[in-house]
Amino acid sequence: MDDTLATDVAPTALPPAPGADRYRSLDFADTAATLPAGQSYDLLAAPESAMRWLAAHDLTTPDVQLYEVCAQRMRTLRAHIRTLFAARVDTTAPPQESLHAVNEALTAVPTAPLLAWDGARGLRRIQAHPTDQAVNHALATLAADAADLLTGPDADILAACGSAPCDRFLLRTHGRRHWCSTRCGDRARAARAYARRSGASD
């Protein structure tokens, strides 16, 4: 299951969707999308761009090198998270495959600092994630974040952008908000105005 798109071109003048600052999994889900103008982008299309996204979200350090297999695992988890988000928005039962994938990521590594004993410093918390497990740790963190969103109070305001063909997700931080950006909102309003004018002239 993979929603990889053909390009890693970043969207221009398109801010993060509402709620992306509170849930990294929401921003993660929106790393691949189709914009209102029909342009597609995928910020995880290549290992280099996937690494930049992880580093920008404090999910790894810049010295970690990503390979295509790691980027593919990120894209696969993203596809499953998007499927779970869509099921929540549509109030349908989520596929067991996607639940299993998120649960597998959740339990792959501990996401919290572990308690360890150091003879010189005593008890302390440590992140027991060697470099080769950096992606496992990032995916576990994103899976936990998605689970928190889907089971918490904000699940009720999770929505899909209402300006087709844009398929980004957002939190409806305002009751009547149905778009992921001003750009999408303006386009939807313009389309409605055009439809009204066309109907009046028939």
Give each language-model segment a name.
Residues 165-170, 188:
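Cys/His-rich microdomains that often coordinate metals
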Residues 27, 188-191:
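Alpha-helical elements of the RecA-like P-loop NTPase motor core of helicases
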Residues 1-160, 168-169, 201-202:
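Short helix-coil boundary/hinge micro-motifs
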Residues 192-202:
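Contiguous alpha-helical segments
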Residues 175-187:
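Cysteine-rich micro-motifs
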Residues 160-165, 182-183:
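Short, cysteine/histidine-rich loop/knuckle motifs that typically chelate Zn2+
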